[in-house]
Amino acid sequence: MEPITVNYKVLDARAKVPAYATPGSAAADLCAVLDEPLTLAPMERALVPTGLAIELPGAHSVALVYARSGLSIKHGLCMANGVGVVDSDYRGELKVPMVNLGREAYTIQPGERVAQLCIAPVYTAAFVPAEELGDTQRGEGGFGSTGK
């Protein structure tokens, strides 16, 4: 598949261009742009700047920001909002809302890879009111209703 073009603007000279770690990576790494190391105590949150703004190609794309698996598993450093959603019309700086869910403080170093950016297509929906919804085998079952 051909790569799509995502224009980016450097807002801070220390910013690193998002990069894919391997040819099979689904997301590109985002790096912290910090004046000094940032220590997050357990349960502390911070908005980590990247020094970059992006322009997504058209209204039917989105950038999703995810935690890096190694940081979350080894240190409890996660996205404070679960998944960051960057809308196609947003032109401000990409910032990563992070929370330390670990038991020990964690220090983010300037230039450290802190999150992953995944570009994906988006469907917009026309929401239509309905008196009845189609039947399915699952029906209204949710929250573990399909078993372990």
Residue ranges and their predicted role:
Residues 1-148:
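DUTPase catalytic domain/fold
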